[in-house]
Design a protein with these regions (language model features):
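PLP-dependent amino-acid enzyme catalytic core
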Residues: 1-170
């Protein structure tokens, strides 16, 4: 979308988050036609869609306790710094967003769990800005940029994708 702005937490920059789309897909009974209507038709035409009338969404909201919040670049840097100072652990920018918002929703006596979402090395520039040094690179990623890249564009056809995977498994 033309309204999407680049930030130091790029998964938050996308207008159509695939993980959210996947969640809604599963929530609504894995109905591809309904997902297309929501994410392609309604979102493109109106910039949003509303699930509040859906019984499945009402149930999920109650079950999962949806909450939201925001995190700016400055918040992200401060959270990375505070986690490092407190735990001597480097977290990535997405996890920092989650920690920042989770801290706002904490309740006394109620545990809060935030799952790490990426490796800090993926966001080395922001980690360096926050901590004054680059995060360590896991050994398994040394030289990854020099490895060959393989890309195959295919139509959005489940049968063709499955066939390609089966034929190209090594």
């Amino acid at each position: 979308s033309s309204d999407t702005q680049e930030t130091s937490s790029p998964s938050m920059d996308i207008s159509k988050a695939s993980n959210f789309e996947r969640f809604v897909f599963n929530l609504l009974g894995r109905d591809g036609a309904q997902i297309r209507a929501l994410f392609h038709d309604q979102l493109n035409a109106h910039g949003s869609f509303d699930l509040s009338a859906s019984e499945a969404f009402k149930s999920a909201a109650e079950t999962y306790g949806f909450q939201s919040g925001k995190s700016t670049h400055a918040d992200r840097l401060a959270t990375i710094q505070s986690i490092y100072a407190q735990f001597n652990d480097i977290i990535d920018t997405h996890t920092a967003d989650g920690v920042k918002v989770a801290r706002e929703h904490m309740q006394p006596g109620v545990p809060m769990i935030v799952l790490e979402t990426a490796l800090p090395i993926k966001f080395a520039e922001t980690i360096e800005e926050a901590l004054g040094r680059l995060p360590p690179r896991p050994a398994r990623f040394e030289g990854i940029e020099a490895l060959p890249k393989r890309v195959r564009l295919m139509p959005a056809d489940v049968a063709q994708i499955k066939s390609y995977i089966v034929q190209n498994l090594h």
